[in-house]
Amino acid sequence: MESPALSEFDLHLFAEGRHWHIYNVLGAHLVNHRGTEGTRFAVWAPNARAVSVIGDFNNWDSGRHAMAVNNGYGVWSLFIPGVKAGHLYKFAITTRNGHHITKTDPYGQAFEHRPSNAAVVTERGHYAWGDGDWLERRNRFDWQQSPISVYEVHPGSWRHHGSGRWLTYRELADQLVPYVLETGFTHIELLPVTEHPLDESWGYQTTGYYAPTSRFGSPDDLRYFVDQCHQNNIGVILDWVPGHFPDDDFALAEFDGTALYEHEDPRRGRHQDWGTLIYNYGRHEVRNFLIGSALFWLDTFHMDGLRVDAVASMLYLNYSRNEGEWLPNEHGGHENLDAIRFLQDLNRVCQSRFPGVLMMAEESTSWPRVTRPPEIGGLGFNLKWNMGWMHDTLHYLQQDPVYRQYHHDKLTFGLLYAFSENFVLPLSHDEVVHGKSSLIQKMPGDDWQQRASLRLLFSYMFSYPGAKLLFMGGEFGQRQEWSERRELDWYLLQYPEHQGLRKLVQDLNGLYRRYPALHRKSFTSEGFEWIDCHDSTQSVISFLRNPGTPEHGPLVIVANFTPIPRHHYRIGVPTGGNWQEIFNSDSTWYGGSNLGNPLLLQAEPTPWMARPCSVELTVPPLGLVMLRPAT
């Protein structure tokens, strides 16, 4: 059967790894061929002996619709009249060894509900977007001078319907968007909603890189969710997984009977920790598949950024491997040179084609220049998760306050590297699962001390340099560990103590937006000065946040990490005059004891801590206060 030809130019760009709209070429696309409506199918399978399309339109008969191959590029294609949106399909492949295998479409844009895995022919381009103003503003987004506060969400467990089922994308839009707007976050980060077979993987074992999971609705339902976020001035970041993929036999693994997407040598092609396969980043068509996926989400779903998962596992050939279990690169080193080039290309292409999007790296090592331009040897990300800050801060707060003085360096060490990258401070899903306990349950002491310590943690995060990220449930003190099987413990919000925690996060988000000192210069040392980092005996730290502009004043931050109030605590300040307390994590409004500084603090001409003036204040137990010059 004659097929509408794929252009030589399309195939040439794909073979070079530079076709940035490959999602309009490969896969299944509704077309009109010589006056006949139908669907054109195209798939890359260069080592196959034969490929045919099977589906519910031909009774899954592999003898009905054989595809033709362009031998120069290994792309098989076929036009089938009468196949419409909603029809199910797969590819029946005969390998060069004569084996018969069935695969779903790597470029499929919708799939059946799991455990079924056929792709679904979809019609794209009819959703009526209403976010034009948002996209126009995003093009001018100066993220380095703006507040970035991210609410990390697993869509299947944020909240359930009354019957216990998941909320749909549209129901999430109607419930999650107002909640996030009220709580004050600037962005929602969705754990992977790319299609995946296993609920327990949380989406991190992706099989459909061009399709939103059907668990929560249709592709247009997800577009509605993003659209509603944008119309309420909330950005959407997609958690995206280019580091590995599952070895399910219906998907990418040995797609045409050979190691096509993965590296054929298991010393480079198999991830030992996760039992998954690793992409062959040196292959042009594989790089194009992945970069095309990233662009697909930014283009057709208007995503505002990608959080790239497990970057460290991509960068190191010896990641989680013993001697003899890995192959060195061409120079004898452990760096994955192909993955480095892939990440540089990914960031360069995404940021040039979609100005204002955020590319975030979850990179857990000290790999240099993750957030520096490729032109100077960097990977080109905008932001990197600060895993060191997270580990040190949680380790410190898990100590009994009596012993925190011996771990004071956990608070101070991070400032030695805080501006070496553009950092996000992540209190993510990874910290509240697998026996790690919830954030509030990590805190020692009785219930009051646990809540005070959690308020202190959030206050410290919002006053510390860097973008912010908080996993759902933390904002109101979820006590159970997170599980993808159940919704959050929303009943806790009937109690004033948990209402207070959420009010605290609301107000911290408000302060973060309102005061330039907290969000400008967050990625440069100009925005931070220690006042006193040496008071380990009392477990108190104090520092300045500077906005870098004369029209906006600095903020003074003082934090007490013990349950002992610090009365008449003297700190140096940069100017004389009156200072005003604008925030106190111990306020009764948040469930605290209301110990603080209700009156103006008069700076005295007493030099202190290399500052020309000083003030005496009360620092509440397990509390943090913010001061600003009184006007």
Swiss-Prot record:
One GO location term (cellular component): cytosol
Any one GO molecular-function label of the UniProt entry: cation binding
One annotated GO biological process: glycogen biosynthetic process
UniProt catalytic activity: Transfers a segment of a (1->4)-alpha-D-glucan chain to a primary hydroxy group in a similar glucan chain
Function as written in the Swiss-Prot or TrEMBL entry: Catalyzes the formation of the alpha-1,6-glucosidic linkages in glycogen by scission of a 1,4-alpha-linked oligosaccharide from growing alpha-1,4-glucan chains and the subsequent attachment of the oligosaccharide to the alpha-1,6 position.
Protein family according to the UniProt entry: Belongs to the glycosyl hydrolase 13 family. GlgB subfamily.
Protein name stated in the entry: 1,4-alpha-glucan branching enzyme GlgB
Taxonomic source organism: Marinobacter nauticus (strain ATCC 700491 / DSM 11845 / VT8)
Taxonomic classification: Bacteria, Pseudomonadati, Pseudomonadota, Gammaproteobacteria, Pseudomonadales
